[in-house]
Amino acid sequence: MSNNTRAIVAACLTAACLSTMQTANAADTKSPYPAEVVDLAKKASEGPLTDDEANRLISDYPDLAASLPDYRPGKSTEKEYVVPDQTTEDNQAEAHTTEKCSTAHRAEELRSLIVQQVLYEMETSVHFCWNELRVTKVDPPVSEFRNVYEWQNIEGEISNRAWIDDNHEGHAKHMYQVANEIPYVGVVGRSHPYNSFTFKPGGKVLSSGGH
């Protein structure tokens, strides 16, 4: 065999090996989930599954179920509280013009299909002031994410609003965008967690939230 022939054979063998290695590497990163399961994961990221659909993922694909949100009623938790901050009286003696200030807090927690797994918790705080006649001040809300699961990506703030309306009530709302990813596939959906508040004259606070 001539030197040229040996070189050609060696090159062919090298190319074949490279091709085989590339094919093997591609197989390693290929999704192990059937197409219908990926479709079910996308559905879970957009809204509530039926109990049968959720149970299938939990029993057959527990690693996948751990990274998917559970939007079925009663599966997420929330908590709210108001912390007294300070009281300041103005120059008038009337009780209805006494200004008080507090900080309201609300946390919205999203859990996965695996009940014990928290995907994230978003807590929002708003400092506000009022008297008996009107809300006098609402600061922009400030939020913090805790217990963020590895397949949840906090992409950024969508809106941050604080205002007082014509009825002298205060309002605040904070919303974020979170990407929901699953192994081997990537992003299958996005949630938009938010906390919102309404502040009444006299200091009453109403709050709500969602994803």
Predicted features and spans:
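Mature secreted bioactive peptide module from preproproteins
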Residues: 92-211
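N-terminal prepro-regions of secreted/extracellular proteins
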Residues: 1-110
